[in-house]
């Protein structure tokens, strides 16, 4: 290959080369200026600026002061070179305490004056300049994560007329809830809001009131206290992620347009202690009322129009001890439930009864803490009354099994058998098995094919793993393998090429008579 064919980029029009350089970190983009005189001046037209002081560790021993000086001089030179040219995106990350905050403010004011539309700031111990919150050009604003990045709204005018995305992570919002309300009220066209680790358990209230909002992520790590009051007035919201300790009260919950919700509500340590998961304390053969340790009923009623719902294991716990009665989810067509060995299924019978139009049920693990209260949907103790599963409208059941639970007593297989015995409308059972060990997948498929499908004789059964997809009918694989796939974080192989297709019925033949031999 000759030089001409290898240097095709240089032959591109200058605006195209500048656009390509905009996708590089600014330090790397600047280094291309030594390639030729033409490239030296092209760098001045890059519209995306990305500065990170950690990029200045060049292998030579330098003090923090020296590194900070090199970093600040570089940023100064770049901004001076560009003059008053327009800026699309400005990203600045400063993790070194020796960076001069006055110069940082100057950089931010520089790009604000040049009409920046995306601003991404992560700066240690930095009070954000108020000029950010009256920008007429910002479309996306990301603040944090950083320790002691402070948002002080000490002026009356907060107005971001074009802002559509606001991302706040580990930012200290002054004036507590009032400052936060002031910020949101100044964003008249906001569509996406991400709130990460704000730590508002000490606020008097938190209110998210944005009529134009379509997507909301509300996440806070483990806290020792319950937020006092949380309200949502977002009538056009279609997507919600909410993970936090339950609030003491939810005065207003307006999710009239909600389509999909991922709920990770949890009890605090004190509430978990009060709940005391001992069944002899709160449950008996009679139907003794369990103790409520909080109240999330108003919030759950507020999301009852949702169509797709994901509940974490902790949220199932909240349903049990903080919701009475469980609301009716008339629009719900897909429900995903996460389980673990410490969570009970007490609330599942009531939840499933109140999902009259549910089509797809997804269970991440089947292990849970057994007791008599979950017997309506569980095989651990056969209920005296008919199971709510007998009237279940579910057509597709998806189960995620993991090879790390050392489960050797057959309880998960018995639970699957119980589902097949009780769910009359079931058309498809898909088991995602997180293992690369093919013989284990084959053995699981063999056991599943032997289960008598009493309530759903026409139910198709599939087992999908990293390398194999085993199906009772091969055509069903072709339509399901690439439809609703398991989460990427648990199953990174789902984007790989299709695995080998095997019809286990050809290998194993018809199922034997109903007995327990298929378990072992």
From Swiss-Prot:
SUPFAM superfamilies: F-box domain, RNI-like. Keywords: Leucine-rich repeat, Repeat. InterPro entries: F-box-like_dom_sf (IPR036047), F-box_AtFBL13-like (IPR053781), F-box_dom (IPR001810), FBD (IPR006566), FBL60-like (IPR055294), LRR_dom_sf (IPR032675), LRR_FXL15/At3g58940/PEG3-like (IPR055411). LRR repeats lie at residues 170-197, 219-244, 340-365. It comes from Arabidopsis thaliana. This is F-box/LRR-repeat protein At3g59200. Residues 6-54 form the F-box domain.
